[in-house]
């Protein structure tokens, strides 16, 4: 006889991307902190985003060891989009390739929070990094959006950047927050979009676990989520399985847990 964990409901497996802030109140992620995190929750983490400018801010030797620890646990690392945007502003995008390779980071995020890329330029950079064996994630949206997201526009961008070589699209947290306040029906339509499995939705670490439980309730246990603080990764997996007050211990009523 064995006693097993409750399973996630539905098909597939939603992805989890943590955001590695470095030493921070959201979860210490120095070398030993990352090793402890991965020993406990590594099996539930797919990606680790190296926060903002940390590829430059954190000394290279310890950061390389952190990246190597993630790689050993089969967690893919990628640099945050702010680093790309800064390099683009400085006219030094190509300098990212040797910097990231030297650190062992094999992925990067391309975003447009504080810069604008025309579609041809965006797709060219995605292809440029793919040709150099980087995995590329594109982030859709801005940190201060002016109006609710247009699903047709988002769908077109997902299709275009996937064709250019991006393997996933992250939807900026601020875009989701604005939609939730102004027209939550858009989120219901988003869940039915044929390209929904190609995106990760950013969550707000400061709104854990309420917002995360709400996203699971709205999109299902296998929704792919990004921006997860390291200290929240294990509890998030519990929420996905119906464990915790945030989901009212739905493991006891599995028929009520969204697929």
Predicted regions and their residues:
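C-terminal alpha-helical cap/extension of soluble enzyme domains
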Residues: 7-11, 194-259
């Amino acid at each position: 006889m064995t006693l097993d964990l409750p399973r996630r409901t539905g098909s597939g497996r939603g992805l989890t991307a943590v955001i590695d802030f470095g030493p921070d109140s959201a979860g210490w992620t120095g070398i030993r902190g990352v090793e402890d995190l991965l020993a406990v929750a590594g099996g539930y983490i797919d990606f680790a985003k190296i926060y903002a400018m940390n590829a430059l801010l954190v000394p290279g030797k310890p950061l390389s060891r952190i990246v190597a620890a993630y790689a050993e646990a089969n967690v893919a690392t990628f640099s945050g989009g702010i680093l790309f945007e800064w390099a683009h502003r400085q006219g030094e995008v190509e300098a990212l390739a040797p910097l990231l390779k030297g650190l062992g980071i094999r992925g990067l995020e391309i975003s447009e929070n504080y810069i604008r890329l025309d579609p041809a330029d965006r797709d060219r950079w995605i292809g440029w990094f793919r040709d150099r064996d980087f995995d590329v994630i594109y982030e859709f949206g801005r940190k201060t959006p002016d109006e609710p997201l247009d699903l047709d526009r988002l769908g077109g961008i997902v299709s275009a950047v996937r064709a250019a070589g991006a393997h996933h699209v992250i939807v900026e947290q601020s875009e989701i927050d604005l939609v939730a306040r102004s027209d939550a029906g858009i989120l219901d339509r988003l869940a039915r979009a044929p390209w929904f499995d190609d995106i990760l939705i950013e969550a707000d670490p400061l709104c854990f676990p309420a917002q995360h439980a709400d996203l699971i309730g709205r999109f299902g246990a296998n929704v792919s989520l990004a921006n997860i603080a390291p200290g929240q990764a294990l509890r998030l997996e519990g929420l996905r399985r119906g464990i915790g007050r945030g989901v009212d211990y739905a493991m006891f009523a599995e028929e009520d847990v969204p697929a």
